[in-house]
């Protein structure tokens, strides 16, 4: 390994290597961490080097480790996109992760990351989940995804006992290039908020009629440029929308409210474009909005209530012991505060990994226990914000 500095090349070596096979590097602004897989004894060697750069302010933030990862999608390239978490309310440890595949359909995984089901229904972009809807005289949970092949809402019924998904058809929208989506539920019913690349956002009321789900357009909203990530808070009635190159906005989610937006947080030195996935974490008096800051491979937390105070940011590094690489260029993410069993007793964050390494493979999703995020940002210790 060579580094050019001070007008000359400096040579570094990793000792005790027989057959170096793969090299993974991570840089935290001050040090370079190298992990080399030795194909001879199948061990992993770590070398830490001083790697600070003069005249550059280091963008250093806490690192957390993933505890697990899902099976990969089938094809290389930009395929995996947005996860959702379905909570098995009878047996939380049997909950499922739904992951969209922009080239093929919808993947379903257990909490170990093993794929349990795949629905080859076309190019799905974003997905969200809600619970306890009556369809054809039976109670189902429901998942809705945006289908880019038909600019539609693709509906799936979820067996509340097993987590098995069933394709329940599509609802056409008025969007020309459908993109992101989130669901919202209040006393008036279940709503879907699909958005398009033009900045248009539609609000659809979803109702069961016979053995199918039908939709009615009830409201239109707008941001100036391309959005994608969004999340609705059923309790507070707030709809958060990420405008990728600009800011996170909040709208009233109720269909009878004005379509007027308020800025939550804007692109800055701490939040980098693209703004991608958004998710909400609620536990006791903690109410956080989690944001994918894709441009600098990090995640931002702000309060999910006015004045939307800054809480901190972090990155997801590699778990060497488990052979799981770190995460970069995250599109979608999802979080739950439900106790899913160890190690997810305080909840779970699931993120899409844009570059799946160690070894090089198609994209997948990484799982992070909320406890490590809570510890890294000192969220439970006091009310201060942290870098």
Predicted regions and their residues:
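Sequence/structural signature of beta-propeller domains
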Residues: 1-387
């Amino acid at each position: 390994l060579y580094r050019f500095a001070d007008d000359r090349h400096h040579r570094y070596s990793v000792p005790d290597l027989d057959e170096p096979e793969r090299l993974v590097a991570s840089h935290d602004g001050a040090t370079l961490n190298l992990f080399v897989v030795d194909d001879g004894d199948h061990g992993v060697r770590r070398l830490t080097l001083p790697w600070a750069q003069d005249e550059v302010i280091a963008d250093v933030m806490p690192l957390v480790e993933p505890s697990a990862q899902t099976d990969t999608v089938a094809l290389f390239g930009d395929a995996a996109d947005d996860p959702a978490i379905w909570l098995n309310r009878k047996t939380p440890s049997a909950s499922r992760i739904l992951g969209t595949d922009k080239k093929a359909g919808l993947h379903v995984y257990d909490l170990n990351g093993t794929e349990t089901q795949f629905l080859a229904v076309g190019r799905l972009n974003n997905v969200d989940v809600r619970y306890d809807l009556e369809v054809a005289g039976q109670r189902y949970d429901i998942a809705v995804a945006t289908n880019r092949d038909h600019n539609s809402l693709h509906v799936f019924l979820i067996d509340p006992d097993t987590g098995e998904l069933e394709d329940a058809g599509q609802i056409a929208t008025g969007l020309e290039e459908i993109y992101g989506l989130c669901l919202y539920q209040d006393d008036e019913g279940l709503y879907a908020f699909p958005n398009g690349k033009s900045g248009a956002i539609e609000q659809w009321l979803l109702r069961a009629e016979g053995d199918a789900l039908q939709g009615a357009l009830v409201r239109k909203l707008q941001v100036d440029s391309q959005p994608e990530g969004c999340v609705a808070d059923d309790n507070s009635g707030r709809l958060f929308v990420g405008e990728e190159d600009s800011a996170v906005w909040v709208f009233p989610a109720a269909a009878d409210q004005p379509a007027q937006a308020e800025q939550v947080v804007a692109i800055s030195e701490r939040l980098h474009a693209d703004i991608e996935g958004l998710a909400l974490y609620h536990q006791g008096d903690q109410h956080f909005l989690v944001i994918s800051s894709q441009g600098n491979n990090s995640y931002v937390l702000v309060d999910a209530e006015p004045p939307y105070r800054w809480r901190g940011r972090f990155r997801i590094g590699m778990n060497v012991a488990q052979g799981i690489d770190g995460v970069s260029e995250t599109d979608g993410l999802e979080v739950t505060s439900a106790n899913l069993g160890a190690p997810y007793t305080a909840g779970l964050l699931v993120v899409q990994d844009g570059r799946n390494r160690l070894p090089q493979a198609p994209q997948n999703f990484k799982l992070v226990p909320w406890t490590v995020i809570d510890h890294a940002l000192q969220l439970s210790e006091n009310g201060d914000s942290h870098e």
